[in-house]
Design a protein with these regions (language model features):
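An N-terminally biased module of ancient metal coordination in phosphate/nucleic-acid-related enzymes
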Residues: 1-94, 179-180, 192-275
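C-terminal active-site subregion of NodB/CE4 polysaccharide deacetylases
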Residues: 261-267, 272-298
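Extended substrate/RNA-proximal surfaces in nucleic-acid metabolism proteins
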Residues: 51-228, 284-300
Length: 302
């Protein structure tokens, strides 16, 4: 079993990259893709930690985090960490997310794009802090960074900050009153198009995947048009297995995959406590992404 859509504290998850590796061992995953929003900051940490565990296991050490079935407990598997990212894009006024799998995250052009994107996000976050201060909330961007070290600050971090400092009673309240779309302290971020994201992922040697298309609430014709456009540019996969899909929705996306000769991808979209009903690997409890999905997406070695 694999999970090809996972977030860490480096974006808006609550598990560190290392904790994700430990938890993936507990869940019995053979692999997971770390796909933080618009950042690759957690990849080195997760990949390095997984390799350290493999070396320790080869030297005879046990893995203290393992809690899989008794039959496997003596030799738990350290999961492969797939280098990935989830890029924020916009298409005809809708937020569309593109997952990149197997990316060369050290590729210069890719790294340069992320640096520019992070600077743009920082400017946006400064503006949101200023608007929140106008609403009698004591917040600075420096305070956010201090509270969430190493993270690319998202609206979820704003919400958690407001919650921890007593300005709101729930994360939902933060989005309803302050930082949700069309709320008084919301500032839209600069975005690329889905087509540009596909090209960026391909340029980094990665596999571009359209993430959770059902969540965009597009008409069938409009979604079909988007997929057709992206296929022409080089889209490789589409997320047909996802935590919130029902049977009919999965069938619909599998149909699109078949129509446009796209490979199936799947994942939980695990965020830890920020999405408490969604678990790693199993989503709402019934998610299952077989290893074959990963192997079908894996690029051929050159």
């Amino acid at each position: 079993m694999v999970d090809l859509h996972v977030h860490s504290t480096c974006s808006d998850g609550t598990f560190t990259p290392e904790e994700l590796v430990d938890y993936a061992i507990q869940k019995g995953l053979t692999a997971f893709a770390l796909t933080d929003h618009d950042t690759v900051n957690g990849l080195d940490r997760a990949i390095r930690y997984a390799e350290e565990l493999r070396q320790a296991q080869a030297a005879g050490s046990s893995l203290p985090t393992a809690s899989v079935s008794d039959a496997d407990a003596s030799m738990p598997q350290v999961p492969e960490v797939i280098p990935g990212i989830e890029l924020s894009t916009e298409y005809q006024g809708k937020d569309i997310h593109m997952v990149g799998l197997f990316i060369d995250y050290r590729q210069p052009e890719f790294a340069h794009y992320l640096e520019d994107f992070i600077r743009s996000r920082e400017n946006r976050n400064e503006k949101m802090c200023a608007l929140l201060r106008e609403h009698d909330i004591d917040i600075t961007y420096e305070a956010l960074l201090a509270e969430f070290p190493g993270a690319v600050i998202t609206r979820a971090h704003f919400a958690r900050y407001l919650l921890s400092h007593g300005y709101i009673q729930s994360m939902k309240e933060a989005f309803d009153r302050y930082v949700g779309d069309h709320c008084p302290c919301f500032v839209p971020r600069e975005k690329v198009t889905p087509a540009q994201a596909v090209e960026l992922i391909l340029g980094a040697g990665g596999v571009p995947v359209l993430a959770h298309p059902i969540l965009y609430h597009m008409s069938d014709d409009r979604l079909d048009t988007l997929v057709a456009e992206l296929k022409k540019i080089g889209l490789v996969g589409i997320e047909a297995i996802y935590s919130t899909y029902n049977t009919a929705e999965e069938r619909q996306i599998r149909g699109l995959a078949s129509k446009y000769d796209l490979k199936i991808s799947g994942g939980s979209d695990f965020h830890g406590a920020n999405k408490p009903k969604i678990d790693l690997g199993t989503g709402w409890g019934k998610l299952y992404v077989p290893d074959e999905v990963l192997e079908n997406l894996r690029p051929e070695k050159k």
